[in-house]
Amino acid sequence: MMSRLNSVVIKLWLTIILIVTTVLILLSIALITFMQYYFTQETENAIREDARRISSLVEQSHNKEEAIKYSQTLIENPGGLMIINNKHRQSTASLSNIKKQMLNEVVNNDHFDDVFDKGKSVTRNVTIKEKGSSQTYILLGYPTKAQKNSHSKYSGVFIYKDLKSIEDTNNAITIITIITAVIFLTITTVFAFFLSSRITKPLRRLRDQATRVSEGDYSYKPSVTTKDEIGQLSQAFNQMSTEIEEHVDALSTSKNIRDSLINSMVEGVLGINESRQIILSNKMANDIMDNIDEDAKAFLLRQIEDTFKSKQTEMRDLEMNTRFFVVTTSYIDKIEQGGKSGVVVTVRDMTNEHNLDQMKKDFIANVSHELRTPISLLQGYTESIVDGIVTEPDEIKESLAIVLDESKRLNRLVNELLNVARMDAEGLSVNKEVQPIAALLDKMKIKYRQQADDLGLNMTFNYCKKRVWTYDMDRMDQVLTNLIDNASRYTKPGDEIAITCDENESEDILYIKDTGTGIAPEHLQQVFDRFYKVDAARTRGKQGTGLGLFICKMIIEEHGGSIDVKSELGKGTTFIIKLPKPE
């Protein structure tokens, strides 16, 4: 109900009705009052004119009785005529009740003294009680020449008339006026409602459009064809709606681009407001914050507080467990609505760069060491032979064997470096063929039989000779050679090395398992990285270059497969190779 009363249509309709009703009431009152006054005046004027004629007739007539009788024929109500010579000397014995009361009114009302003393016409409304009811009469006194035996300056012609006919006429006029006003008000009500509805229809459309715009719907554009202010308002609103839609689309596009850029960044990005609340973050930042420890959180909070105080860009290094970050905080004057300031935090994960830098350092140290040792041996034994220190044939042969072994070691190191460089420059190519896996494993079995016996290792091969795989023989030979060499290097006499085949619905699987020293958990994620080497104390004798497992991974991935490692420190390591089955 209240919502309807608040409607512009209802308000405008009620306003029009109120104005029209007020005007009709005032006009009706004025009309009724005027008509009452008009008929009263007309009656009074008619009575006065009758009184004047009777007065003139009486004054000019010599026979007063005949003049009075004749006068009674001149008026509408002959019984309402009284000619009084003396106000204070009148007999009421033969008069009717009404005339008695009228005569008493003339005698007792001082206003009528002016008729007898001053010769003025006097009119009064007199209420007469008769038969238990009251009736109003108009009583007019008109002066005439004093008659004989009169003690006053003037005699008076008095005429009275019942006002009931006037009242009936006024009542009829009042009823007609009220009925006319009601009919006019009804017509006005309908017309006002129609007019207000028509006038406010464009406004209601604009209201609906504004509601839709507030809800994000800019497609509704009402058509208002009028040329008035409402039509101009509608056109302006439609134009505004179009511009808002364009601006919102532009802002949405900018926001989407910004969010996409922020989410695609490799750095974690956080937006912090004055209340130290996170109002913006990307996926990388969420991942970092989910895995951050309390000390790192305290570090970030301190840097954020320092940035709020200094309002300068701060850049600091953060080390957390085995990960390394560079944290940059920048002060922003306006980061959210209301002109509130804040801080943008950028967290860059530098773990890979740090590890790569460390691996390069280790690689340089290892390669230098690997090169220095065989070169020193080559130099020492060749100098011994050249200088004649070693002269016995057996000693010379032994020295040359050492020189040959160290030369092979240098050649292997250089070849690995060249292979990696070639892979980086040209990529790795494999020539896959469908062939029995037994061909590869038989080759490995023969190749490492003597080495296993020499090292005291129990090496077993368990595979199905009829099963065929899709692989490059030379490349897979390189992979297994590297893995079995590693297993031999990290085991001791009595340990086991097992090479086993398996399969699932879509892949052929090869396990290389040893019971050696194993790999610590913190090294597992990095064993396939370039130049990465685990603790040298784990190895038996010679160390590698840190490139073997990296090359293995590249070869397996080029086959469309994967390589993984599982290890438990002190219990052994298992490398798992998965290759797609032949189509």
From Swiss-Prot:
**Gene encoding this chain?**
srrB
Q: List the record's Gene Ontology CC terms alphabetically.
A: plasma membrane
Q: InterPro entries recorded for this chain?
A: HAMP_dom (IPR003660), HATPase_C_sf (IPR036890), His_kinase_dom (IPR005467), HisK_dim/P_dom (IPR003661), HisK_dim/P_sf (IPR036097), HisK_sensor (IPR041328), Light-responsive_reg (IPR052545), Sig_transdc_His_kin-like_C (IPR004358)
Top-level taxonomy: Bacteria, Bacillati, Bacillota, Bacilli, Bacillales
Which parts pass through the membrane? 12-32, 175-195
Q: Residue ranges of the HAMP domain?
A: 197-249
Specify the enzyme's EC class, one word.
transferase
Topology feature Extracellular, residues: 33-174
State the protein's name.
Sensor protein SrrB
Q: Which residues carry this modification: Phosphohistidine?
A: H369
Catalytic activity as recorded in UniProt: ATP + protein L-histidine = ADP + protein N-phospho-L-histidine
> Hey, which stretches end up on the Cytoplasmic side?
1-11, 196-583
PROSITE patterns listed in its UniProt record: HAMP, HIS_KIN
UniProt feature coiled coil, ranges:
none
Coarse class of the protein's main subcellular location: membrane
